[in-house]
Amino acid sequence: MVVTDSPVSGIMADQNIDPNTTTSPSPKEKHVSAIKAISGDEKAPSKEKKNYASKKSTTVIQKSHCFQNSWTFWFDNPSSKSNQVIWGSSLRSLYTFGTIEEFWSLYNNIHPPTKWVSGADLYCFKDKIEPKWEDPICANGGKWSMMFPKATLECNWLNTLLALVGEQFDQGDEICGAVLNFRARGDRISLWTKNAANEEAQLSIGKQWKELLGYNETIGFIVHEDAKTLDRDAKRRYTV
């Protein structure tokens, strides 16, 4: 795990994080199943492994389960936004992780959505991609967005993250990352993608995301270029 910048005060519930110590995840079956599927631990241990485990040993071998991609958490502090001269200058990279163990160590030490203030933004993007329209990989892309009440926000954010790091999207190479926006008018989760012109890929991502979260309402895809020029008047390019 790489600490890419000093953590912003207040975002982490415990900033003294040991990447080799993993806090137990939420006991929800779907989360446990997702992690087992990623790590390849679905099968029960063999008898041989059980025999080894039963022997007394002073040495503990810890096995890390690597993701296909490394990911970085970013944070945008609402108090800094009001003072920024250039858009995005208040963005701060927090931590970069590449294993299941590092992910849970970080996730379980981030304050839950109920403790966040309006105007804050949390990002989880593939490493080396900055969550900005100006980033070369994001520049020609767009985003799918869903609105959630506080009661279901944390669960849907976690499921979105697990789908991303677990490479559960057929068009996963098209995805840049996910954004969690805390707003007075409604909290929102968005998926940023690379190529808005690739209609087939965008529709596939939107449909799969809805299925993964069991989301029944229509969602829309906004092109970044349209959002830059038209702001809230930007029209949906695609809907599913």
From Swiss-Prot:
UniProt-annotated stretches for the region Disordered: 1-51
GO function terms (MF aspect): RNA binding; translation initiation factor activity
GO cellular component: cytoplasm; nucleus
Taxonomy of the source species: Eukaryota, Viridiplantae, Streptophyta, Embryophyta, Tracheophyta
Keyword set includes Mitochondrion: no
Cell compartments where the protein resides: Nucleus; Cytoplasm
Record's compositionally biased regions (Basic and acidic residues): 39-51
Coiled coil: none
Disulfide bonds: C138-C176
Post-translational modification note: According to the redox status, the Cys-138-Cys-176 disulfide bridge may have a role in regulating protein function by affecting its ability to bind capped mRNA.
GO annotation, biological process: regulation of translation; response to virus
Family of this protein: Belongs to the eukaryotic initiation factor 4E family.
Biased composition (Polar residues): 17-26
Assembly, per entry: EIF4F is a multi-subunit complex, the composition of which varies with external and internal environmental conditions. It is composed of at least EIF4A, EIF4E and EIF4G. EIF4E is also known to interact with other partners. In higher plants two isoforms of EIF4F have been identified, named isoform EIF4F and isoform EIF(iso)4F. Isoform EIF4F has subunits p220 and p26, whereas isoform EIF(iso)4F has subunits p82 and p28.
Annotated mRNA binding sites: 83-88, 115, 133-134, 183-188, 228-232
UniProt keyword list: Cytoplasm, Disulfide bond, Initiation factor, Nucleus, Protein biosynthesis, RNA-binding, Translation regulation
Annotated organism of origin: Arabidopsis thaliana (Mouse-ear cress)
Keyword ATP-binding attached: no
Job description of the protein: Component of the protein complex eIF4F, which is involved in the recognition of the mRNA cap, ATP-dependent unwinding of 5'-terminal secondary structure and recruitment of mRNA to the ribosome. Recognizes and binds the 7-methylguanosine-containing mRNA cap during an early step in the initiation of protein synthesis and facilitates ribosome binding by inducing the unwinding of the mRNAs secondary structures.
Main subcellular location of this protein, as a coarse class: nucleus
Protein name per the record: Eukaryotic translation initiation factor 4E-3
Gene: EIF4E3
Region (EIF4G-binding): 65-68, 75-111, 159-168
Highest taxon of source: Eukaryota
